[in-house]
Amino acid sequence: MVAQIIDGKKIAQQIKSEVAHLVQMRIKAGDAAPCLAVVLVGHDSASQMYVTSKRKTCESIGFISLAYDLPNNVSETELLMLIDQLNTNHSVDGILIQLPLPVGIDNIRVLEQIAPHKDVDGFHPYNLGRLCQRAPLLRPCTPRGVITLLERYNINIVGLNAVVVGASNIVGRPMGMELLLAGCTVTITHRFTRNLQQHVQNADLLVVAVGKAGFIPGSWIKSGAIVIDIGINCLDNGKVVGDVNFSEAIERAAYITPVPGGVGPMTVATLIQNTLQACKYRKLS
């Protein structure tokens, strides 16, 4: 068995085209284009790369992109004041704070400061709570992007045993909630989990997000499983790989996402979907 590749680049491009069309329809109807404010604190090269990609994507589909590049020594109070200004700016539909933030700034407090209806990353406790209550509004981008990939490939996951390896607030925990909402029986593993191999071997659907290259050997993959690799790891030789041993896993899985080109593009695609959704909420309110 050789797994079918789940092409995140292709699906992400489809979504961008769909959103661009909807934006043009809004503009023709006399409505404003969606506006996303992206806040970058400091000079982390990876964060700068991600922010540049997000801004270019927004502009390419007709969004208004506002850039706020703050110095590394900005205080938490100053950052919170900027968020308050963006919250009350009626022309701004979405606010994105690029993570991680510098040492000394409380990530949770900053994310909680964003108005829930402008929280296009889906990290605010209100939006996470709505997801837990089976009434999602703005959903965390990477987990929602995974669900979209499965939907676009017509992969039925209802009733499957889903195992999420990694329990981060950004990916693992909301991923578990998304899979539960989709009808899976969900296990979330973490650093205290015993017998990780046994859990992985029982997974009909495996989602891995730990940030460790090749962490899951292909021999652990259940034959015919669906493998979603969210990890992005850069090796010393410059090669980018995921958390799953791809060359081994592809021989056992039924479907698998590559790294790069799998889940990564879907995160940005979901961000623009969320921003358009936030824009629609603003018009209705």
Swiss-Prot record:
Protein name: Bifunctional protein FolD
Designated gene of the protein: folD
Superkingdom assignment: Bacteria
Gene3D superfamilies in the record: Leucine Dehydrogenase, chain A, domain 1, NAD(P)-binding Rossmann-like Domain
PROSITE patterns hit by this protein: THF_DHG_CYH_1, THF_DHG_CYH_2
Function: Catalyzes the oxidation of 5,10-methylenetetrahydrofolate to 5,10-methenyltetrahydrofolate and then the hydrolysis of 5,10-methenyltetrahydrofolate to 10-formyltetrahydrofolate.
Single Gene Ontology BP annotation: tetrahydrofolate interconversion
GO MF, one annotated term: methylenetetrahydrofolate dehydrogenase (NADP+) activity
Residues reported to bind NADP(+): G166, A167, S168, I232
EC nos: 1.5.1.5, 3.5.4.9
NCBIfam families hit by this protein: PRK10792.1 (NF008058)
Pathway it works in: One-carbon metabolism; tetrahydrofolate interconversion
Family: Belongs to the tetrahydrofolate dehydrogenase/cyclohydrolase family.
Hydrolase is among the record's keywords: yes
Organism listed in the record: Baumannia cicadellinicola subsp. Homalodisca coagulata
PANTHER family: C-1-TETRAHYDROFOLATE SYNTHASE, CYTOPLASMIC (PTHR48099:SF5), C-1-TETRAHYDROFOLATE SYNTHASE, CYTOPLASMIC-RELATED (PTHR48099)
GO cellular component, one term: cytosol
Keywords on record: Amino-acid biosynthesis, Histidine biosynthesis, Hydrolase, Methionine biosynthesis, Multifunctional enzyme, NADP, One-carbon metabolism, Oxidoreductase, Purine biosynthesis
Presence of keyword Cell membrane: no
Assembly information from the UniProt record: Homodimer.
